[in-house]
Amino acid sequence: LDSIQQKRKEIWNMYYQNLQGISSLSLPVLPDYATNNAHAFYAVCATPEERTALIRYLKSHGVYSVFHYLSLHKSDFVKNQKWEVEELPQADKYTDCLVRFPLFYALEPDEVKYICEQIKSFYTSERDEASFGER
């Protein structure tokens, strides 16, 4: 179990180190008081359109990234209750803009490098920025 956890942390750190220079992506913040269990690696895109374009771009290059979750206040369960639910714009921002990248034990360093190269390529290649909205 320790070796599995250690490898996941190494993969997480590879992502973090390789993606730090992309100003359009917000990377995870690990407070000084916390520890990293490396269960997932994610980034937050500037807009929902950007996230959709990034996921589509990565898929076209053989990388399967996914969105993370639906805000609980917008889930069918909550919608079907008689509760008065307020708007939660920060939760919605993460629902709409967060993307998770592959992170599993069998992932090899050269694969992580390739994924990071594709993410960088998305942000550095010439593309029609209108295709994913305003920054």
Residue locations for each model-derived region?
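PLP-dependent aminotransferase class I/II
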Residues: 1-135
